[in-house]
Design a protein with these regions (language model features):
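Structural recognition of the beta-strand scaffold that forms the well-ordered cores
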Residues: 76-84, 122-128, 175-179, 222-226, ...
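Short acidic, Pro/Gly- and aromatic-enriched capping/linker segments at domain boundaries
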Residues: 52-68
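Feature marks short, surface-exposed loop/turn motifs that line or immediately flank catalytic pockets
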Residues: 85-88, 127-134, 184-186, 230, ...
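Mature N-terminal segment immediately following signal peptide/propeptide cleavage
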Residues: 63-83
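Bacterial Sec-dependent N-terminal signal peptides
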Residues: 16-53
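Aromatic-lined substrate-binding rim segments of carbohydrate-active enzymes
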Residues: 96-185, 200-204, 251-266
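Extracellular glycoside hydrolase catalytic/binding regions
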Residues: 59-62, 86, 90-106, 191-223, ...
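Sec-dependent signal peptide recognition
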Residues: 5-12
Length: 316
């Protein structure tokens, strides 16, 4: 998978709560009452389950403030790192098939080697690779598609592979940005994504599972990137595209539903894709993603913009 740099853009909402005191008169005579123990009354709007950090957290909490990530001291934190995927094909066939321990051993050794060489990374983009969650008995429909997704296999290897690998990264001081299995539909038999389609249902299921996981929920070292490029959506006019007002209008609705699903479970930082190869975001200025601790997962490929050329190639 290609490396990218994440750029943050988010609105924070501050809520001011006003309270009032009653002006009821005091009765002339009060009967003494026995002392009552202090009992905390239940609050129907209590969100205590989502308050406080996961006890498995080992990294300082970060939050999205304007266009920056900041720590609890208000200092700007820049993340720089790499991406890692877990198919043997992309890892020199270093292990056989579904050998979990072989996969862990190899990828941990890669991390150790990178750090030993002196690279100062503090985050990794972790692909929850569909190699593990696909049902191999089903026919493949497209490259890294969602059609063969097995919830049983996903839960199994989330526990056995992805969470242990994430814990290893965090033990090395690296934040983990998880992305879902595979890529958005972008080739036959699809023209792209659309509101209410099977891919949106797939993402809702994946993130509902991940955001409720006891070792990931509210873990200060874990963030969620909702989907992976390329992103082409059916707009309000019925056409599929990656630009224009109508496409952004539906894109906001598409990803807002997933944001809301995650927020019902956890407070982890969320990274929202844009259109095209996650390079188009202007429409979000009008059709805003609502919520806190949300940024944009902007993908930028320097080579495409001519950084590898001896002369200006006028790309971009």
């Amino acid at each position: 998978m290609k490396n990218m740099k994440n750029t943050v853009s988010i609105l924070l909402f501050l809520f001011v709560f006003l309270s009032a005191c009653s002006d009821d008169s005091i009765p002339e005579k009060l009967k003494p009452e026995p002392p009552q123990p202090d009992v905390e009354e239940p609050n129907p709007d209590d969100d205590s389950e989502n308050c406080g950090n996961n006890q498995n957290s080992v990294l300082p909490a970060l939050s999205v403030v304007g266009r920056y990530l900041k720590n609890e001291k208000g200092e700007i934190i820049n993340l720089h790192g790499f991406t890692q995927t877990y198919s043997p094909f992309f890892n020199n066939n270093a292990w056989n098939n579904y050998d979990v321990q072989g996969c862990l051993n190899y990828n941990k050794s890669m991390v150790d080697g990178i750090l030993a060489a002196g690279w100062k990374f503090n985050f990794v983009r972790m692909h929850l690779d569909p190699y593990w969650s696909d049902d191999p008995a089903m026919q493949s429909v497209r490259y890294e598609g969602h059609e063969r997704f097995s919830e049983f296999r996903f839960r199994k290897y989330l526990d056995e592979l992805f969470v242990p690998m994430a814990e290893y990264f965090m033990s090395k001081g690296m934040y983990v940005v998880m992305r879902p299995p595979g890529v958005c539909p972008n080739e036959a038999p699809y023209q792209g994504i659309e509101l209410g389609d099977s891919y949106q249902q797939f993402l809702l299921k994946v993130w509902n599972i991940v955001s409720q996981h006891p070792k990931l929920k509210n873990n200060t070292g874990v963030m969620f990137e909702l989907a992976n490029e390329p992103v082409k959506i059916k707009g309000t006019d019925g056409t599929y595209g990656s630009t224009g007002d109508g496409h952004f209008q539906n894109l906001q609705l598409y990803f807002q539903a997933i944001v809301d699903k995650i927020r019902a479970n956890s407070r982890n930082i969320i990274w929202v894709p844009g259109l095209s190869y996650q390079s188009s975001y202007a429409g979000y200025a009008k059709y805003r993603i609502q919520g806190e601790n949300i940024g944009f997962a902007v993908h930028c490929y320097p080579g495409w913009y001519g950084s590898d050329a001896e002369e200006d190639v006028a790309k971009g």
